[in-house]
Amino acid sequence: MKQKLKTKSGAKKRFRFSKTGKVKFAHAFGSHKFLSKRPDTKRKYRKARIADDTNMLEMPRLMPYGR
């Protein structure tokens, strides 16, 4: 009987897949201490980031049932 592969729970909480198969995740350092940050920096933190090609190589191991 073949065993199921398990998704890493930390990756499940942090990453989402776009419809085209790219991996999206949130910016770091964007959850508090906004008084000392510029408005354009705060705006940048609201937007999701896309993982680069180097990090995409790890995704099948972390999330085997992702797209």
Swiss-Prot record:
Keyword Ribosomal protein applies: yes
Top-rank taxon: Bacteria
GO terms under cellular component: ribonucleoprotein complex; ribosome
Keyword set, alphabetical order: Ribonucleoprotein, Ribosomal protein
Annotated InterPro entries: Ribosomal_bL35, Ribosomal_bL35-like, Ribosomal_bL35_CS, Ribosomal_bL35_sf
Record-level Gene Ontology MF annotations: structural constituent of ribosome
Claim: Ribonucleoprotein is one of the keywords in the record: yes
Membrane-spanning ranges: none
One record GO biological process: translation
Matches recorded under Pfam families: Ribosomal_L35p
Family (UniProt): Belongs to the bacterial ribosomal protein bL35 family.
Identification of the protein by name: Large ribosomal subunit protein bL35
Name of the coding gene: rpmI
